[in-house]
């Protein structure tokens, strides 16, 4: 079992390339920050990433996020999805949670952007320059998701409208991602 075999097998690479091509032929980036998505929030994440001593500073972040989701009336799914299903789910979701992994960043931020899904991240000053001009929802703490009367869905809907105005409207054009 090797990293190369797991992530770069010919079959997996071809499936992912076909999926990317199909998704990008559907509609221009940012045209879908709204009404055509099937689900509001993709919540699948595990705790194992932050168990490493290398990332002690992020320990507890994902557990805290899970508690916030529960209090805000959201269901958290922690199931592992095959890569194709994972990409399709990102493409069908308006937002996805991208808690820190082995660093303040997460691969999910970039995967989400690639599939027209808005990543929800913890605001981290050194990364603001990376996110400038991108539809990334940076929150000061996970508790901010509860600021609309304790309802995560209402908070995200309000932010979706703001982000659509900024990134999906005529002012920015269709190619904003």
Please provide the spans of the model-predicted regions.
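Short, C-terminally biased terminal segments at protein or domain edges
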Residues: 150-156
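Nucleotide-sugar donor-binding catalytic core of glycosyltransferases
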Residues: 1-110, 114-137, 156, 162-177
């Amino acid at each position: 079992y090797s990293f190369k075999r797991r992530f770069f097998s010919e079959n997996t690479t071809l499936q992912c390339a076909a999926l990317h091509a199909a998704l990008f032929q559907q509609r221009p980036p940012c045209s879908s920050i709204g009404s055509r998505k099937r689900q509001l929030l993709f919540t699948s994440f595990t705790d194992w990433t932050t168990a490493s001593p290398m990332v002690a500073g992020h320990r507890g972040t994902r557990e805290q996020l899970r508690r916030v989701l529960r209090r805000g009336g959201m269901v958290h799914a922690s199931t592992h999805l095959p890569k194709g299903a994972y990409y399709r789910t990102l493409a069908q979701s308006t937002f996805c949670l991208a808690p820190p992994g082995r660093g303040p960043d997460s691969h999910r931020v970039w995967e989400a952007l690639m599939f027209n899904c808005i990543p929800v991240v913890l605001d981290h000053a050194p990364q603001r320059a990376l996110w400038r001009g991108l539809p990334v929802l940076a929150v000061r703490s996970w508790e901010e998701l509860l600021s609309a009367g304790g309802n995560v869905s209402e908070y995200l809907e309000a932010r979706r409208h703001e982000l659509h105005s900024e990134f999906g409207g005529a002012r920015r054009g269709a190619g904003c991602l």
